[in-house]
Amino acid sequence: MPSPLALRPYLRSEFSPSVDARPCSSPSELPAKLLLGATLPRAPRLPRRLAWCSIDWEQVCLLQRLGAGGFGSVYKATYRGVPVAIKQVNKCTKNRLASRRSFWAELNVARLRHDNIVRVVAASTRTPAGSNSLGTIIMEFGGNVTLHQVIYGAAGHPEGDAGEPHCRTGGQLSLGKCLKYSLDVVNGLLFLHSQSIVHLDLKPANILISEQDVCKISDFGCSEKLEDLLCFQTPSYPLGGTYTHRAPELLKGEGVTPKADIYSFAITLWQMTTKQAPYSGERQHILYAVVAYDLRPSLSAAVFEDSLPGQRLGDVIQRCWRPSAAQRPSARLLLVDLTSLKAELG
């Protein structure tokens, strides 16, 4: 019996968002504020589409490292005196093409402004001398805490096989708080999808919570612009993402649609309400079962049975992780359902 999982295809060869392939911004060495004795070389021009976001390196001041992921490190810093987060994308020695793709994918949200999306402030492909960085992205500082940390209380824990911290029970998240955070995330998805952008790696670890208790979607390194996908005769399937949150149609190598984010949201909402990890077991076994046998996390927890709002929330989750992408609700319909449910809860 052939496997329902798709063979991993090669990435397309060009990821620059512009036909102008020149490097973005400058300098190749950091200025005196970051590296004593360095000089500022002449700044090459950005690709025309991104010229507005060239980095003024003299205004950058790194403060502390916040963490590291599969494609780079994130630092807290100030830029022009304002708190920001700075992401340095590594030159992945095993798959540099994937690193390049991650860098340019992060800029899919350049110029976009929304309360529930982490904003890109500036970007550059110029890096400090001797560094292993492919490029630098300066982003709005969305907060010190991720939704993953709020759910599991996992701040400071080592990373697990799925690229997230090992889980332990966190503080209580009320049903009302789950719905509040869910509305933030769905509002962000609705905006992204209206711009023909799909995130493709939505999960609690990629959702920041600001000091104002607002959820902001971050980490667009796996994102795609739907219009770009249509430009290639052979489909482009992102290599990144987190397998526990990945829609079954993507695991099978089918086309990318916004409904893949809706599936990921369903797993995320399930995590918020149960405070549990979605699956346990061998990665390949889970992938096969999700595709071949419609494996999903259990909805037998008391939170989905003890109250009418809990039952309705379980129904919402079930609709969002249906095997057929066409049968899942859009972000707009989901927003209506969750708003109604939150009003019912009071």
UniProtKB/Swiss-Prot annotation:
Subcellular location: Cytoplasm
Keywords on record: ATP-binding, Cytoplasm, Disease variant, Kinase, Nucleotide-binding, Proto-oncogene, Serine/threonine-protein kinase, Transferase
Phenotype upon changing S264C: In OZEMA20; likely pathogenic; loss of function in oocyte maturation activation; loss of activation of the ERK1/ERK2 cascade; no effect on localization to cytoplasm
A GO molecular-function descriptor: protein kinase activity
Active-site residues, record numbering mapped to chain: D201 (proton acceptor)
Tissue: Highly expressed in oocytes. Lower expression is detected in early embryo.
EC number: 2.7.11.1
Keyword presence, Thylakoid: no
UniProt cross-references to Pfam families, sorted A to Z: Pkinase
Reactions performed catalytically: L-seryl-[protein] + ATP = O-phospho-L-seryl-[protein] + ADP + H(+); L-threonyl-[protein] + ATP = O-phospho-L-threonyl-[protein] + ADP + H(+)
GO cellular component: cytoplasm
Effect of A123T: In a lung adenocarcinoma sample; somatic mutation
Enzyme class: transferase
Annotated binding of ATP, by residue: L66, G67, A68, G69, G70, F71, G72, S73, V74, K87
GO biological process, one term: regulation of meiotic nuclear division
Highest taxon of source: Eukaryota
Function of the protein: Serine/threonine kinase involved in the regulation of MAPK signaling. Is an activator of the ERK1/2 signaling cascade playing an essential role in the stimulation of oocyte maturation.
Record disease entry: Oocyte/zygote/embryo maturation arrest 20: An autosomal recessive, female infertility disorder characterized by early embryonic arrest and fragmentation. Early embryo fragmentation is defined by the presence of anucleate cell fragments derived from the blastomeres. Excessive embryo fragmentation is associated with deleterious outcomes, including decreased implantation rate.
Family statement: Belongs to the protein kinase superfamily. Ser/Thr protein kinase family.
Name used for this protein in its record: Proto-oncogene serine/threonine-protein kinase mos
Gene name of the record: MOS
